[in-house]
């Protein structure tokens, strides 16, 4: 078991490969990446046998930008017999159980990649889950409580209906969602589908127990590039008053709430009203990521806000390098000023050729 499988958005396999290579090296782990273009996943093969498990425990999943899921996997099982796929899978898990206590397992996820071709397997995966779960429980697995120390999820990652990786992830260091995807329902009254990006960002970056404390009716926000109001909608829904900055029109439904002021200005030139404390800045403007990074940094250095969520658009070829440069620029500028901060970034399911960044002064 010297392999990690990392799920990612189709077309971002090279970024995922570069990131896991860098982050593993920081932990003193080296290996090579197997990349298939547009497959929606990569396999990182460690040079030493137990290092994949070490990374699954110790490499902070929340710090991986392009990974939707991270799990330790076996060699690929191929030519699974159609009449009995379960037996070879259980045999593989029995080998894993010699080193890993599978009695600590709490859940089973039977998954495939998030590609148009692989999605055809989803129906099969759903049907296969029930009989496999019953068989694994007979082995004494999948019976631990959700609060089990060192709890595990068991995963099957199908490439075809007769070929899969068998693996596991650690409950404290993974995504609990099937395929690593947090699926959200589009609100019927939202002005645009971009609203789901900010909703997913809030659910991803802000601790559930802190959401109402950090986002409530006593707070003020600025939305740069707000039109028609997809991101403003999420803030107003949580009670915030929003200065919506855009030359374009905002949805009438948002004006009717009485919780927005439309500022028909350039997002790069706008400054918050004097003597008005701004808690949050959000920004989904289509612009070079370096310009957005500079603008966001300016807001923090000027003391105009203390928390922000923004997107960095990535249409260029060297996307991973661009992300690293932008995040390093922000971190360097804030550190030089002596500011303590929390910085997280993620390629969210509802993002496309972009990543979402969460930044908060401490």
Curated annotation (Swiss-Prot):
Its EC number is 2.1.1.186. Keywords: Cytoplasm, Methyltransferase, rRNA processing, S-adenosyl-L-methionine, Transferase. Signal peptide: none annotated. GO terms for cellular component: cytoplasm. It is found in: Cytoplasm. The active site is at 313 (proton acceptor). GO terms for molecular function: S-adenosylmethionine-dependent methyltransferase activity. Catalyzes the 2'-O-methylation at nucleotide C2498 in 23S rRNA. Monomer. HAMAP family: 23SrRNA_methyltr_M. This is Ribosomal RNA large subunit methyltransferase M. It comes from Aggregatibacter aphrophilus (strain NJ8700) (Haemophilus aphrophilus).
